[in-house]
């Protein structure tokens, strides 16, 4: 992975992820091949915070059809990043 911005693709904004922000847990969509160490280094480099823990999950592709053509959606990887207690809050919502 060349760049921290190549690893962290975008924040995941759902009702559950917004509620977890009060506990200093932030959810990001990340590159499927990125390891937890690479994700930790990328978050610390981009936002300037300390990461305590990272949980990752890979969502399965779903079968989709467009007319007679069948295919699958892309595989996605999400990372739930827990910050240390003394870290500042991330303000990527604006």
Curated annotation (Swiss-Prot):
One of its GO terms (cellular component) is ribosome. It comes from Exiguobacterium sibiricum (strain DSM 17290 / CCUG 55495 / CIP 109462 / JCM 13490 / 255-15). Coiled coil: none annotated. Belongs to the universal ribosomal protein uL23 family. One of its GO terms (molecular function) is rRNA binding. Part of the 50S ribosomal subunit. Contacts protein L29, and trigger factor when it is bound to the ribosome. One of the early assembly proteins it binds 23S rRNA. One of the proteins that surrounds the polypeptide exit tunnel on the outside of the ribosome. Forms the main docking site for trigger factor binding to the ribosome. This is Large ribosomal subunit protein uL23. GO terms for biological process: translation. InterPro entries: Nucleotide-bd_a/b_plait_sf, Ribosomal_uL23-like, Ribosomal_uL23/eL15/eS24_sf. Keywords: Ribonucleoprotein, Ribosomal protein, RNA-binding, rRNA-binding.
């Amino acid at each position: 992975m060349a760049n921290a911005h190549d690893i962290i693709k975008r924040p995941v904004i759902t009702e559950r992820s917004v509620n977890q922000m009060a506990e200093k847990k932030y959810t990001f969509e990340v590159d499927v091949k990125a390891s937890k160490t690479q994700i930790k280094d990328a978050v610390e480099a981009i936002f300037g915070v300390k990461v305590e823990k990272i949980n990752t999950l890979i969502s399965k592709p779903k079968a989709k059809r467009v007319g007679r053509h069948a295919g699958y959606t892309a595989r996605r990887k999400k990372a739930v990043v827990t910050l240390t207690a003394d870290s500042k809050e991330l303000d990527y919502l604006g």
